[in-house]
From Swiss-Prot:
This is 2-C-methyl-D-erythritol 4-phosphate cytidylyltransferase. It comes from the Bacteria. Pfam families: IspD. It comes from Microcystis aeruginosa (strain NIES-843 / IAM M-2473). InterPro entries: IspD, IspD/TarI, IspD/TarI_cytidylyltransf_bact, ISPD_synthase_CS, Nucleotide-diphossugar_trans. The gene is ispD. Belongs to the IspD/TarI cytidylyltransferase family. IspD subfamily. Catalyzes the formation of 4-diphosphocytidyl-2-C-methyl-D-erythritol from CTP and 2-C-methyl-D-erythritol 4-phosphate (MEP). It catalyses: 2-C-methyl-D-erythritol 4-phosphate + CTP + H(+) = 4-CDP-2-C-methyl-D-erythritol + diphosphate. Its EC number is 2.7.7.60.
């Protein structure tokens, strides 16, 4: 299984002017925790990291002490997550048939989650890790008035990894570029192209580090694991 990690974003909501994946969590950069879990996964054999050139040196410095037993390639990232994943798909080794895409900011994903997700591609063309929504969700208009309350039993919070057949995902990305679609995850491209996407149950602790509060929660979760 091949793994692509989008890592080209900035940490604006973290109040930082640098790539948030280079920030420290429990003594290591966020990206290091993601890589360590990927290294322990039995299914993953190759890792590609899409990043901006100004971060290449720091990312190499993160990779080196991990003593990676699997090939890790740094790939030029794009202006958006969507464009970064497109670049990553073009850089996959020849013969890659399936791929996992995992946000580097979800640095608490476990090796077991990677392995379960990899296995899911034996039964579908595309899937996302997700967990059932616990809170009641409200649809609100631009002025703050509630318009609707969707049935919570049908709502799931999307996570990563997300996994796909490489050929199909490339075709959907090309269609998205042709029609100028803008999406926030790769599953949305398959949906817009009319392909079904399956749910694989994710992990409650697989949160995305977006704000300083998320970082504090992640510190606590890691302290309980180590």
């Amino acid at each position: 299984m091949y793994l692509l990690i989008p890592a080209a974003g900035m940490g604006k909501r973290m109040g930082s002017d640098r790539n948030k994946l280079l920030l420290t969590l429990h003594g290591k950069p966020l990206l290091a925790w993601t890589l360590l879990a990927a290294m322990e996964s039995r299914a993953i054999i190759w890792i590609g990291i899409m990043a901006q050139p100004e971060d290449f040196e720091e990312i190499r410095a993160i990779i080196t002490p991990i003593n990676a037993l699997k090939p890790v390639q740094i790939i030029q990232g794009g202006e958006t997550r969507q464009k970064s994943v497109y670049n990553g798909l073009q850089a996959l080794p020849e013969g890659a048939e399936t791929v996992l895409i995992h946000d580097g900011a979800r640095c608490l994903a476990t090796p077991e989650l990677f392995d379960r997700c990899a296995a899911a591609l034996a039964t579908c063309q595309g899937f996302i890790a997700a967990i059932p929504v616990k809170d009641t969700i409200k649809i609100v208009d631009s002025k703050g008035w509630i318009e609707d309350t969707p049935d919570r039993s049908r709502l799931w919070a999307a996570q990563t990894p997300q996994g796909f057949q490489v050929k199909l995902l490339k075709e959907c990305h090309e269609q998205g570029r042709k029609l100028d679609w803008e999406v926030t995850d790769d599953a949305a491209l398959l949906e817009k192209c009319g392909f079904p996407v399956k749910i694989v149950v994710g992990e409650e602790t697989n949160l995305k580090i977006t704000t300083p509060g998320d970082l504090a929660i992640a510190e606590y979760i890691l302290s309980q694991r180590l």
